[in-house]
A protein has these predicted regions:
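N-terminal active-site segment of His-dependent metallophosphoesterases
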Residues: 1-87
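Conserved catalytic scaffold of divalent metal-dependent phosphoesterases
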Residues: 77-168
Length: 168
């Protein structure tokens, strides 16, 4: 289907909460097919791209934290799996020539970053570095409750006003 720009300023695909590696594989396949069909000008990842469960305070509540030598392999595995998931989407974005890409950090990435900041020697595991956002061509938008990503008249954020009560 040829792309028509009649009355369209920009086309975008926006994806929230993929939670790699716990993602729904069929849903990700649909996203990839939608990208091929829509051929968006802009792609926006609304965060929680990774699950990062081992770095959540919820995960460790009531448990003893594992020693660092056990956590590093979990961290490496999670980083690998999340990058693999992002690669699936980026490959399709590359194929259709979508170069405007935004990554809005979600609370799950905040879990990762909070863990990493406690151990300065792990700085290469911060979201921006671990997910290779610069190399992938993403503009990075840290988790920020006061400032949203704004494109035209639309605002994009992770979870700010998107609960079941968002319209009240």
């Amino acid at each position: 289907m040829p792309k028509s720009n009649d009355g369209v300023i920009k086309r975008a695909i926006v994806t929230p909460d993929k939670h790699f590696p716990l993602h729904d594989k069929k849903a990700i396949n649909v996203v990839c097919k939608a990208i091929e069909l829509v051929k968006p000008d802009v792609y926006i990842d609304l965060g929680d791209t990774g699950e990062w469960e081992h770095f959540s305070t919820h995960f460790w509540k009531g448990r003893n934290a594992k020693p660092m030598e056990d956590l590093i392999p979990l961290l490496d595995s999670d980083v690998h799996e999340v990058n693999k998931g992002m690669d699936m989407i980026d490959n399709v974005l590359d194929k259709i020539g979508c170069s405007e890409r935004h990554f809005v950090q979600g609370n799950h990435e905040v879990w990762l970053d909070k863990f990493v900041t406690r151990y300065p020697y792990l700085s290469h595991y911060m979201t921006y570095e671990a997910l290779k956002l610069k190399q992938r061509g993403y503009k990075y938008h840290p988790y920020n409750r006061k400032k949203c990503l704004k494109i035209g008249k639309l605002n994009f954020t992770h979870g700010k006003y998107t609960t079941k009560y968002h319209s009240y």
